[in-house]
UniProtKB/Swiss-Prot annotation:
Pfam families, alphabetized: DUF1016_N, YhcG_C
Disruption phenotype: Deletion of this gene results in a synthetic-lethal phenotype when combined with hypomorphic alleles of the replicative primosome (dnaB), DNA polymerase III (dnaN), and DNA topoisomerase IV (parE).
EC number, UniProt record: 3.1.-.-
Domain notes: Possesses a PD-(D/E)XK-like nuclease domain.
Any GO MF annotation of the entry: DNA binding
Protein name: Putative nuclease YhcG
Domain of life of the organism encoding this protein: Bacteria
Lineage: Bacteria, Pseudomonadati, Pseudomonadota, Gammaproteobacteria, Enterobacterales
Family annotation (InterPro entries): PD-DEXK-like_domain (IPR053148), tRNA_endonuc-like_dom_sf (IPR011856), YhcG_C (IPR009362), YhcG_N (IPR041527)
Length: 375
């Protein structure tokens, strides 16, 4: 390939940098548009639910069953994202954020009715899209979900504006709410100084990270793929094979299984079904020493699995926390949720020994680390 002359190097660098800026900007705007349209759609669903409930006494009486029936029918169509809890959240979202303005779109001049005069506007679906896409939702969907927990309207508006002004992430917003930043600002004699003390914005989130937001994946019905480090992924793969090689009792159910508790998303590394014990086994891999917080998190997973994943004829689920540390390993079963000690004893007899699992964890780490050193 013929190299560029020195005289054209500066020109090449200019077009190279310009294309990178163009692509990066387009990706960022694409994610922003997906988020805004998704959030606007959920608000519109909430509006329709509220207006249906307010459509007369007959509908008001039926409203108690509306969300339950909608959830059942929509889940048949879309599989996920439309639980009764989510629909109630959409309803609340509309009630709390009716102030969102609708701006003029770029697709054409607006008619007196506010619908752009384009050929696509002849179709009802196009009109709906143009209305929704024009709504201004600059914050991520997860931020609005967190704001719903703020019951005081003034406080909610304050946190919304400060999140926009300061560029807070959801985690930073949660921290400000937890430390009562709004109340402290009200009580302060120098409110301007308080507002200048806001936390700095977190590092800019890349588009590929934003598009993996569970809310976005759920809305688009995309496969929930989770990016792990090569080492952790290899470790989980080996552990999965090792568990299945222990005998015919273990049946593989899934990996990186996602669950939502309140407004937070979690993932369990491996999920098995033990045929003889007739129960689910949740495996959680931790890098580092075992801590009480690991046990608490596993108990939270087990409570969720018992309510949402366990079938009526199955026994309560059990957990296995595997802790991998350089040159060491630990394995701990979580059996506290079982109804009696007899069942717990039976489980222990049927399950692989904790020491055997810990030894396998250490051996696997050594093999993988040796493989990486030889690359």
């Amino acid at each position: 390939m013929e190299s560029l002359s020195e005289g054209t190097t500066a020109g090449y660098q200019q077009i190279h940098d310009g294309i990178i800026h163009l692509v990066d900007s387009a990706r960022t705007e694409t994610v922003r548009s997906v988020n805004a349209l998704m959030t606007a759609t959920y608000q519109e669903i909430g509006r329709r639910i509220v207006e249906f409930e307010q459509g007369g006494e007959a509908r008001a009486a039926y409203g108690a069953q509306l969300i339950k029936r909608l959830s059942k029918d929509l889940c048949l169509r879309y599989k996920r994202g439309f639980s009764a809890k989510n629909l109630r959240q959409m309803r609340l979202f509309y009630l709390f954020f009716q102030h969102v303005e609708i701006h003029q779109t770029m697709s054409g001049e607006l008619t007196p009715l506010g619908i752009p005069q384009t050929p696509s506007a002849e179709f009802p679906s196009a009109k709906i899209w143009q209305t929704l896409s024009a709504k201004s939702f600059p914050l991520p969907r997860s931020t609005y979900v967190r704001l719903l927990s703020v019951k005081n309207a003034d406080a909610r508006s304050f946190y919304e504006k400060e999140t926009l002004r300061c560029g807070w992430s959801v985690r930073q917003l949660e921290r400000q709410i937890a430390t009562q930043f709004y109340e402290r600002t009200l009580l302060s004699h120098d409110k301007s100084a308080m507002l200048q003390q806001h936390a700095p914005a977190e590092t800019h989130i890349l588009p590929q990270q934003a598009i993996r937001d569970p809310f976005v994946l759920e809305f688009l019905e995309l496969k929930d793929e989770y990016s792990e480090s090569d080492f952790e992924e290899a470790l989980i793969n080996h552990l999965m094979d090792f568990m299945l090689e222990l005998g015919d009792d273990f049946a593989f159910v899934g990996r990186q299984r996602r669950l939502r508790i309140d407004d937070n998303w979690f993932r369990v590394d491996l999920l098995f079904f033990h045929r003889r014990l007739r129960c689910l086994l949740i495996v959680d891999l931790k890098v580092g020493k075992f801590s009480y917080s690991d046990a608490g998190q596993m108990n939270m997973y087990l409570n969720y699995a018992k309510e949402h994943w366990t079938l009526p004829d199955e026994n309560p689920p059990i957990g296995l926390v595997l802790c991998a540390e350089k040159g060491a390993g630990e394995a701990h079963y979580a059996l506290a949720g079982l109804p009696n000690t007899v069942l717990a004893s039976e489980y222990k007899m049927q399950l692989p020994d904790e020491k055997r699992l810990a030894d396998e964890l250490v051996r696997t780490q050594a093999v993988l680390e040796e493989g990486y050193r030889r690359r």
